[in-house]
Amino acid sequence: MSHIYLLSPSSAVRDKAALRRGVKRLEAAGHQVEVDANALNRDTRFAGTDAERLAAIKRAAASGADTVMTTRGGYGLSRLLPALPYKAIAKSIDKGTHWVGFSDFTAFSLAVMAKTQRVTWAGPAVVEDFGALDGVDEITNLCFDDLMTHMSEGTGWRIGKDDPTAFSAQGLTLWGGNLSMITSMVGTPYLPPVTRGALFIEDVAEAPYRIERMLTQLLYAGILANQKVIFLGAFNRFNATPQDRGYGLKVVIAWLRAHTKARIITGLPFGHVPTKVLLPVGQTVDVVATRREVLVLWPHDHTHAHHH
């Protein structure tokens, strides 16, 4: 049985019923769920004032939980980066706590990686994933179980028909998350200086031209040149416009392939979609691609991140 600590470090929880469902499902799976005292706080759009949300992170770090999870993403962690209790977070990770989240949580993961060289996990949130009306996605659930039982040692998926095949790369640093969040951190001390990277990206409600514009920033900032592999997750919930005239994600991906030596692999099951694999942000990984699928493999003990 795992001890899960639940907090709201970003936007306020609107769907309380989904939160209750998520907690019930986690409990039904045999976990002991501890909900932070401020989890349902609201201050304008945020889940409490900056001070309240920081206090929740400090409590989570001191909880001794096996896993710290967020209720939801949204916006709010960017405000807290200078004040995060990095030492306490690093200590909790060294003692075996997994910090898990996605979307706005990207800011937390990358800042912790930059400041402490520790591994956190890109993965599900309680409201969106465990509280979903039609049940928890099977793959998301299996990956989460693997993490809970310390069995997590890699992930794999079917790659796109235009993706590069039959290659392998060892000792890459896996990192990434939400593209808008990554881009917002360029030029700050909270973006880790990764070389020999395996970068994964996803985004939601961003038109293809906006995704391309963010990628140009990563390109011109010299970040793409340091990646050996770039994994593309889901880019969804946007509306095409008549002026696009056939310009879409396929064109963006073709542009990306033409402007970076990194191998671009599509189809990563991650993003604002039901199926989410769990990815250790900051972990050293091996990447192996066959004709049809790609495998990302990491060691069992995932407490320390590495900057190469």
What are these regions (language model features)?
Residues M1-G64:
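ATP/NTP phosphate-donor binding region
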Residues Y86-A111, V119-V126, R263:
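Short, acidic/small-residue loops that bind anionic groups at enzyme active sites
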Residues Q117-M181, G187:
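Conserved anion/nucleotide-ligand pocket segment
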Residues T67-A83, F102:
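N-terminal glycine-rich "phosphate-gripper" loop used for MgATP/nucleotide binding
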Residues R72-Y75, E206, N236, F270:
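Short glycine-rich anion-binding loops that position phosphate/pyrophosphate groups of nucleotides
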Residues V35-D36, G101, Q227-A234, I265-G267:
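Short internal beta-strands
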Residues A234-H308:
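ATP/nucleoside-binding phosphotransfer catalytic cores, i.e., glycine-rich phosphate-binding loops
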Residues P193-G246:
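Internal helical hairpin/lid segments
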